[in-house]
């Protein structure tokens, strides 16, 4: 079991599966449609407000297909966890599965990492590899990668939370000492 409480789920597509599941499980859910914001920074200000009001300690960006700005990153330093469908540092950004197939690699996978200002560059928390088969399509490879994302994400959340708690304890001890 994961030592965490879900304080808030934020989605950017109303009616998506995550929103429906949150409602079914009585988890607070907020829709922030990125199309309703003039800039990414304005969206990220709204995210910061929502997360602070909910008392969020760690943000898990699973299925959040938006690049975040320093507004969000600086408000939650080393507390944004992203899951990406490649073995970073290979195949950053969009269409990582397509990039892997185009490069004819034999192994691909997924990476859970902390978010930094440059896309898909933060410290790696966990990775899982999957073979790339000769007859793989983007859909078949993505399906195998996604099953590994589901496997490593809880573990990565636990590790990221532990790192954050340790850093908080060290900071508190320094301030008191």
Features from the language model and the residues they span:
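Helix-adjacent hinge/juxtasegments
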Residues: 30-32, 36-83, 88
């Amino acid at each position: 079991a994961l030592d965490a409480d879900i304080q808030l789920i934020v989605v950017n597509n109303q009616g998506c599966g995550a929103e429906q599941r949150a409602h079914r499980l009585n988890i607070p859910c907020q829709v922030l449609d990125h199309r309703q914001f003039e800039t990414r920074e304005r969206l990220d200000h709204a995210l910061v407000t929502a997360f602070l009001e909910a008392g969020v300690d760690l943000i898990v960006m699973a299925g959040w297909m938006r690049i975040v700005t320093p507004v969000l990153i600086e408000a939650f330093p080393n507390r944004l966890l992203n899951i990406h469908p490649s073995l970073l540092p290979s195949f950053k950004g969009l269409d990582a599965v397509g990039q892997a197939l185009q490069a004819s690699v034999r192994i691909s996978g997924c990476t859970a990492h902390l978010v930094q200002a440059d896309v898909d560059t933060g410290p790696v928390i966990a990775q899982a590899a999957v073979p790339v088969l000769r007859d793989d399509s983007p859909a078949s490879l993505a399906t195998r990668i996604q099953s590994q994302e589901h496997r490593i994400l809880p573990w990565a959340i636990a590790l990221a939370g532990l790192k954050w708690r340790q850093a908080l304890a060290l900071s508190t001890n320094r301030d008191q000492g």
